[in-house]
Amino acid sequence: HTHRDGRLGSVVTGVFHKGLGSVGERNFRPHVSCVRPTPDNKYLCAVDNGIDQIKIYRVNRRTKRLELVDILRCHRESGPKKMKFSKDGKFAYLIYELNNTIQVYRYDGSGKNPVFELLQTESTLASHDDETHDATSGLCMSPDDKYVFCSTAGEDTVAMYKRDEQTGLLEKQCILPISGNYPKDLAVFPDGKHLAVVNHESNSITTFAIDYENKLLIMKGKPMKVETPNSIIFSKCQE
């Protein structure tokens, strides 16, 4: 639990994933890479990069336990990495590190158990060069929920998709280089007009102006030096 001032309290419960992955030299054991509550706060989605599954737990506030209710079984050797929900709570977006795709799911939590319906699968790659080891790593959405962005290491690019708010489906706008190595994460500024990308191997943060009309990302200024960055988030500070 957490305290009102944001401090972490004691651990209330814990779960342990078991099983073997399908990529022996890489992902061969459970490896949870993202945990995301559903927008209705009924369930917790644990994205397991190692065993190609998203385990869905019911949050039992009476017993303070997590109860496994369903498993989304992804393609073997796909490497699910990160998951985000639309603000209206109707759609989920999931990126895959190994097969370099993004998927759209419709979510419905109104029944006895959660329902995830796969709607769309799109590539995150600008090219399909078999000699490049690519890994889609970062996922974010614009503040107005109209655009989805993801970053891919290897070819070192960012993909921008326009999101249909009614259907949840994505339309690719561009996939462009980010002038850095291994873009592990990214975030849109609160103004919705700029994008920051953290580049793990080049020890940098690169920033871009987002030109939605012309479907472009325009680099702004020199990269900022940061030692092996992994993640980035914008948070409003108290005045």
Briefly describe each language-model feature range.
Residues 16, 25-29, 72-76, 123, ...:
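Surface loop/turn motifs at the tips and blade-to-blade linkers of beta-strand repeat domains
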